[in-house]
């Protein structure tokens, strides 16, 4: 997995406005979760290269946006999206245990920062 290019394609939303008017700073929360995860796993940066942090933030931003849209509007099937992401990352050799840890970290950050998360 060395030599990852920076994330391309459709960018995840930076923020979301929920039905009740609450704005969720998706990018900020994903960045916090990514930083925590990679601080605990610096070997990921060594293994995957200089764009590891960008990809981690990108993927966690998507996951948080899917979770918020699923919970708020039922507009996205979070479990289907997570299944897809896990299959993509697994096919690229990314350890699913590390994905699970990153998702737990994202959940912790969301619980700390969002009301009624």
Language-model regions: role of each:
Residues 1-117:
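Core of compact, soluble alpha-helical bundle domains
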